[in-house]
Amino acid sequence: MIRDRDTLNALLDSVERFVRERLAEHVVAETDEIPEDIVAGMKELGLFGLTIPEEYGGLGLTMEEEALVIMAMGQTSPAFRSLFGTTVGIGSQGILLDGLDWQKRKYLPKLATGEILASFALTEPEAGSDAASLRTTAARDGDFYVVNGTKRFITNAPHAGIFTLMARTNHEDKGPGGVTAFIVERNTPGISIGSRDKKMGQKGAHTADVIFENCRVPASQVIGGKEGQGFKTAMKVLEKGRIHIAALAVGAAERMLRDALNYSIDRKQFGQPIAEFQLVQAMLADSQAEIYAAKSMVMDAARRRDDGRDVSTEAPCCKLFATEMCGRVADRAVQIFGGAGYVAEYGIERFYRDVRLFRLYEGTSQIQQIVIARNMIKQACR
């Protein structure tokens, strides 16, 4: 749902200009850091508050509006989007969707301005796709919970001011019902951050382990004030995030296809541009068709969610198709570039590595398939 087309177009124009003029992906790839002036520019644009309601200082974008902005951000290194996207997405959505009023008032305004960043602490060394099997524990001790455990591959962990933490509070319930969601502030004694992970791609987007050792978290920090709701909160957060990541994949694919098209027009072999060869045209056409299909899926799912409809099947469909599509487009782009596509100077190999993560985080492609199929079976058996 687009509330005001003129306002949205002005925002999109600003974001596209920011991406085009200031977000140099080769710099962040070489330094593994996002410059402070770029972070300041993101704050000025309101990117840290995209999805946070206006009453808390954010822009309060609808899902459709958010998807369009994220597609624009997908035109450059995903590391830039990761810095604010984790905060406006999985980092804050648990508080926004299920938090108590005072929790929203305390944290959302600071997140909206970028004063603090938020991370989503769900994944563990032994609990990745099987998120319900997490082992991090939170034992009640008076007015506190004592948290022990390790979270792995946590995006923005080195920079986060708060963590949306999922921990097991009911040790008798080994399933999702034993999981509770907490807001844990970074300066809470007992929290330590591991060294930054050395990754295949997305340099500048930092992930690390978060270790909790007898970390005493006030009982008031339980999201929504009720135990046992953490897994439900996590799934709601991830459902929205799947549309977000699908939109990101569409944007990245559009950028790679544009680069491949321009290269194929300029590059000459056998006395003519390689764009005139039908086998190259087939790769270009297949990529365009798949991008169009993925974008249509994302926009449809976003509108459905804005209308208050159930998108528990559509969201994973978007994530599955769009991220797999993006991988195929990346591969074709490298192929069109030929040997140049394998050399760092041209940049397409960097995108090839960067987008590989899209099929892994916030639910692997295989998890999306399982969720889709289960929903289909459940619907058929009603």
Spans of model-derived segments:
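Alpha-helical interface subdomain recognition
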Residues: M1-F80, T86, D98-Q103, K110-E115, ...
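Short Gly/Pro-enriched turn/cap motifs at secondary-structure boundaries
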Residues: L111, E126-S129, F153-N156, E172-D173, ...
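Short Ser/Thr-interspersed hydrophobic loop/turn segments at strand-loop and sheet-helix junctions
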Residues: G46, I70-G74, A167, V184-P189, ...
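A short, Trp-centered hydrophobic/proline-enriched beta-strand micro-motif
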Residues: G114-L122, M166
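Flexible, small-/acidic-enriched active-site or ligand-binding loops
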Residues: S133, N187-R216
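A short core secondary-structure module
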Residues: F144, N148-I193
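Flexible, glycine-rich active-site loops centered on histidine and acidic residues
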Residues: S92-D98
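Long, acidic (Asp/Glu-rich), low-complexity accessory segments flanking structured domains
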Residues: E213-K232
